[in-house]
Amino acid sequence: MRDRSLDAFRGLTVLLMLLVNNLPPGAPAWMGHGPFGKSLYLADWVFPWFLLAMGAAIPFSRRGFLKRGLPPWLYEVRALRRALLLFLLGLGLTSLQAGRPVFALDVLQLLALAYLVGAWLYDLPPLRRLGMSLILLLGYGAALLLVPVPGVGAGVYREDANLALHLNRTYLAPLGLRGLFSAVPTGGFVLLSTFLGEALMEGRRGWLLALAALGLGSLLLWAFQAVPPGLLSPLLPLGANPLLGYTLPVALKATILKGPLQALLAALVARWGPVGGWVWTGSYMLGWWFVFYWLYRWGWVFRL
């Protein structure tokens, strides 16, 4: 099962990712990542929106699976398989960017762990599921505030001193698991986002209004429900292929496109200054949109 508004939201998220990952020189600071712990800039929305879309898709995926007459336990196995493949794909992409084999946690690996939490705990009754998601989210926040960090103390949350950083440096980084602690709130957020997926699936506007409090992403998803289908069409090619929309540009930019893209950017900036940089960014985004438009037209969707 697929939801048009959810596909459109995923497409918007992929477009946003292409934008913030390819900003030209001199781009406004608010389009990048914000100062640590102070404010949210444009780039800071990308990862949470991926998590939101992932969680909202779980109810659709599970219902479509069970409609085929397959046993529920097989869905859990399938979720484990998808998480494992996504994790391995992330390792491959991280290694490709590093130019050598690397075992480390990056974006796709964290998405895989968060998806596994959301998919496996989705079977819980609604109140227990809500309670578990809040335990993960609030428990993470409480740990940051209350657990003392050696040499720093409790309640300190600076970029150079906080509990997550201490755990990463002291215990997780030597094992290649730097960032594993972040799987706690990301898993909780994906689980919480399953309620949004259920509201979309059942058309419950009251729930959608309540869930809009989750953030701007939820509000956009709700707004997309009221948008005429034709207006959402430009976002669907990327939204139907979000995993490929993330991995393919990153992989090619790190390998065969790296040199040509840098040369083209330098030439455009030298000729037209800041305008040339934006021409490069816009052309890069438009080029990928056309790639995924034709994949969409051909019905080619990459799934794990």
Q: Residue ranges of each PLM-predicted region?
A:
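Alpha-helical transmembrane segments and their immediate juxtamembrane cytosolic regions
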Residues: M1-L304
